[in-house]
């Protein structure tokens, strides 16, 4: 703030300096970071530059970056999100990676129209996605726990869809590019889904303040 004053530039610079300190302290013992886009977007383009710089710094230190954007759309709009966060944009023949995260959280509840265009870019760039399946928030069951005619819950069905989407995008260690977000606040559902989705990486939010634990 001494350099920029009480401005968006100052706030964004403070964010990045704070993040650098965390990354410097943790990169030898923690393999990944998950910056939440909303906390950068609230500081405008200056905040988004701090997000870009944070991702670049984390990757420079050898960390895997999951960009927590929970993007949700269809077709070319979803493809644009994928290009922004995972791919490269064409600027007059020059290929430039705007943010260059390794993975992106997405909402799959628009169905295949919102996922398949992402996977083309994941294949080209060796990236991945994490799809919301059973989320950690208290009201998640209002929708996700509802039973369908198949007698499966909505979250179980979404989990199976993740396995199906990922079947043609398998890595050499037997896991697909399509991961699942499953909250630590629901340990029984977490255990159930882990057994049903053997080829799916799990992103498990909800530790600490939300009440989840190991």
Language-model features, listed with the residues they occupy:
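A C-terminal functional module that forms or caps the active site or interfaces directly
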Residues: 184-214
């Amino acid at each position: 703030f001494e350099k920029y004053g009480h401005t968006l530039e100052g706030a964004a610079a403070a964010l990045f300096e704070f993040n650098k300190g965390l990354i410097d302290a943790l990169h030898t013992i923690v393999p990944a970071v998950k910056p939440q886009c909303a906390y950068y977007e609230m500081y405008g383009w200056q905040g988004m530059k701090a997000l870009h710089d944070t991702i670049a710094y984390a990757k420079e230190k050898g960390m895997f970056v999951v960009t927590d954007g929970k993007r949700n759309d269809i077709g070319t709009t979803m493809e644009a999100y994928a290009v922004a966060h995972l791919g490269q944009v064409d600027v007059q023949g020059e290929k430039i990676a705007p943010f260059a995260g390794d993975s992106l959280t997405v909402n799959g509840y628009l169905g295949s129209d919102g996922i398949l265009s992402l996977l083309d870019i994941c294949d080209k760039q060796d990236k991945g996605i994490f799809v919301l399946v059973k989320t950690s928030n208290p009201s998640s069951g209002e929708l996700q726990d509802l039973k369908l005619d198949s007698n499966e819950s909505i979250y179980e069905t979404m989990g199976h869809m993740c396995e199906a989407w990922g079947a043609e995008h398998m890595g050499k260690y037997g896991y697909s590019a399509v991961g699942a977000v499953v909250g630590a606040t629901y340990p029984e559902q977490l255990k159930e889904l882990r057994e049903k989705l053997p080829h799916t990486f799990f992103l498990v939010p909800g530790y600490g303040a939300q009440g989840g634990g190991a």
